[in-house]
Amino acid sequence: MTAQQGVPIKITNKEIAQEFLDKYDTFLFDCDGVLWLGSQALPYTLEILNLLKQLGKQLIFVTNNSTKSRLAYTKKFASFGIDVKEEQIFTSGYASAVYIRDFLKLQPGKDKVWVFGESGIGEELKLMGYESLGGADSRLDTPFDAAKSPFLVNGLDKDVSCVIAGLDTKVNYHRLAVTLQYLQKDSVHFVGTNVDSTFPQKGYTFPGAGSMIESLAFSSNRRPSYCGKPNQNMLNSIISAFNLDRSKCCMVGDRLNTDMKFGVEGGLGGTLLVLSGIETEERALKISHDYPRPKFYIDKLGDIYTLTNNEL
């Protein structure tokens, strides 16, 4: 069982909120469902992040969203008035690029990557010197015809050594069909950005990257190597990059099977589940073999600010 020991503590008053803040030096935040929902910042997001900075806490942002590059994320943070440096951000697209460089040892300038996903993946690959195909290429938007597809008429690109698959909001048969051709080659590695089956936005729940990657896995009869949360390669990279003490770190997220699992299996000192995204209080308290329980949970992140400042 992966469940964390002890009944999760709900942060409901100033004393518990202060105890929580005092326990940790570094906070790792998921973004979607925690800091914002789509293009809307959640209440008191800016205030709680500023409070943590004033307290001398280290802030790191760890998202399974591969559609944006780290640079694009700094701009999104800036649109909410939040100053975040690129090196503070780890996306699943960036983690996938690091994986093919450091683990698969693919060579920039020689090995190409076929991307099923959006621009964030291709941008991170480009920064590391890799040429990518597919992805946001507008020619993939056209209806599929095997006899006319520019990606098939002259045969597959023989230099493609890897497929990286992530969330693609333009998913269509053309993208699925060409990606499958590369996955049918045993010499081509299969990398998935993240396992999230869904994501919340504007009061709805939408299909996530995992639902699309698993479609490719089913049709190709292959299993991808996932790089985003809860994969520990991603956490190990973060711990190493910032020389962190795991016992003084807390993972803050809105999903039990990715964010909380990421923190618990990574041996972090704490986990905080926020209920502003995908999970419910009932699931947070339930003991399950499929996901761990958090150490703390709260209705929304901004409540820590209002509790500690008596503004409820």
UniProtKB/Swiss-Prot annotation:
Does Hydrolase show up as a keyword for this record?
Answer: yes
Activity regulation: the record says: Activity enhanced by Mg(2+) ion but inhibited by Ca(2+), Zn(2+) and Be(2+) ions. Inorganic phosphate and ATP are competitive inhibitors, whereas pyrophosphate and AMP have no effect.
An MF annotation (GO) of this entry: alkaline phosphatase activity
Output the Gene Ontology cellular-component terms.
Answer: cytoplasm; nucleus
Q: Which UniProt keywords apply?
A: Hydrolase, Magnesium
Q: Name one GO biological process term.
A: carbohydrate metabolic process
Which class of enzymes does this protein belong to?
hydrolase
EC numbers for this chain:
3.1.3.41
InterPro entries from the xrefs?
HAD-like_sf (IPR036412), HAD-SF_hydro_IIA (IPR006357), HAD_sf (IPR023214), PGP_euk (IPR006349)
Name the coiled-coil region(s). none
Q: Report the catalytic activity.
A: 4-nitrophenyl phosphate + H2O = 4-nitrophenol + phosphate + H(+)
The record's listing under SUPFAM superfamilies reads: HAD-like (SSF56784)
Q: Which domain of life is it from?
A: Eukaryota
- Function of this protein? PHO13 is dispensable for vegetative growth and sporulation.
Q: Which PANTHER family match?
A: 4-NITROPHENYLPHOSPHATASE-RELATED, HALOACID DEHALOGENASE-LIKE HYDROLASE DOMAIN-CONTAINING PROTEIN 2
Q: What else is known?
A: Present with 2980 molecules/cell in log phase SD medium.
Q: How does it assemble?
A: Homodimer.
Question: By its UniProt entry, which NCBIfam families does this protein fall under?
Answer: HAD-SF-IIA, PGP_euk
Protein name, per record = 4-nitrophenylphosphatase
Source organism: Saccharomyces cerevisiae (strain ATCC 204508 / S288c)
